[in-house]
Amino acid sequence: MTQSIDQLHLLILNVGLAIHNADWNWKNVSSPFTRLYYIMEGTAQIIFPDGMQELKPHHLYLVPSFTTHSYQCNSHFTHYYLHIYEDHQSESGILEDWNFPIEIPAGNLELPLIKRLCEINPTMQLPQSDPTSYDNNPTLIRNIIKNKQRTFCDKVESRGIVYQLIARFLKDAKPKVEVNDNRIQKVLSHIRKNIYKTVDIDSLAAISCLSKDHFIRLFKKEVGTTPLQYINQKKIEKAQLILITEDIPVKNIGIGRAHV
């Protein structure tokens, strides 16, 4: 992993302890933030499109942003939850660009860390567990503002704890796209820096010092899709994120599409 830690900009939206008795059952949840769980006792399941994940005590679980999933709980179940939002103004999204393990066993440090995170962020507990009560535009904006209004010392300590928890998953994470060619890496960096602008394929070919046809073939070989498809998909993802997390009318979200 060659990314700089300066590229990782994480904000805490919610953190707390949840106690359920067969009432943690929600369907077709999909959010612009990442969910991290530490299971204390009991069992439950998270149902993904490609299968079901059993939640076990003393294990950590990570649910990536924009991943459609459902929850199923038929008995007593206690867990800590942490909702993390990766600042979309960052040049790149590490949580977005990497595949993380869904489940890892907990060590001796994770529980004290997440308990401390709850202790210094008491106002970030969820009033109720129903995702529709907190996974909406006004609530997300309030939570982001609340995060930024905390004391500086709490921000520093909280960020350090979140980094330690995410680091456990980063250890076995793999990039969604493994790019080995430096020319394509430069192009991807340029696309991310200019995602809100109109991106011209000819200019990308010039950055790679290749002819347009050669560039398109090499890009598809390295990334697995054409430059045009990649750029437009990234623009759609960014637009969806802004729509959900910013109080901006749809007509004002003008993200130019790529041009051949």
Feature roles, as predicted:
Residues 1-59, 66-69, 73-76, 91, ...:
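Generic protein-terminus/edge-of-domain signal
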Residues 22, 171-174, 211, 223:
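Short, Lys/Arg-enriched N-terminal segment that forms or immediately precedes the first helix
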Residues 42, 58-59, 82, 215, ...:
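Short hydrophobic/aromatic patches on the structural cores and recognition surfaces of FHA
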Residues 51, 126, 174-177, 195-196, ...:
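Short, flexible helix-adjacent loops and helix caps
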Residues 62, 76-93:
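A short hydrophobic beta-strand segment most commonly corresponding to one strand
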Residues 106-179:
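An amphipathic alpha-helical interaction segment
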Residues 173, 178-191:
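C-terminal/domain-terminus segments
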Residues 185-205, 210, 217-259:
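Terminal helix-turn-helix DNA-binding modules in bacterial transcription factors
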